[in-house]
Amino acid sequence: MNAKPGLVAIYRWRIADEHVEAFRARWTHATRALKPHGGMGSLFARADDGTYYAVALWPDRETRERAFDATGNSEPWPPAERLEPILLDPIENLWPE
């Protein structure tokens, strides 16, 4: 990754076991579709309490908004309870480049 992210978005869901694989496939598709619009990648993970998280990196808030507007949400997502996303403005970034 050449540029450092100016925004980190943390998305959270509760997903029933029978929908996890379909949800993961849809998340992968969405992440790849956002890349040409400025998305810097994402990580999908499961916490100990069963909540699923995606941590997505963006150059800035405006790029994220434009990317979501450009890609739309025409494909349905598998059933999941979506929790409020958390948006972070990085102060110090020591992740590998």
Label every PLM stretch briefly.
Residues 1-3, 97:
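Basic/polar N-terminal segments that are highly enriched at the extreme N-terminus
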Residues 7-14, 41-71:
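Short, well-ordered beta-strand segments in beta-rich or mixed alpha/beta enzyme
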Residues 14-25:
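Short, surface-exposed ligand-recognition loops at beta-strand->loop->(often short) alpha-helix junctions
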Residues 21-23, 64-66, 95:
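Short acidic, gly/pro-rich beta-turn/loop elements at beta-sheet edges
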Residues 53-56, 93-97:
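Short, solvent-exposed polar/charged micro-motifs at secondary-structure junctions
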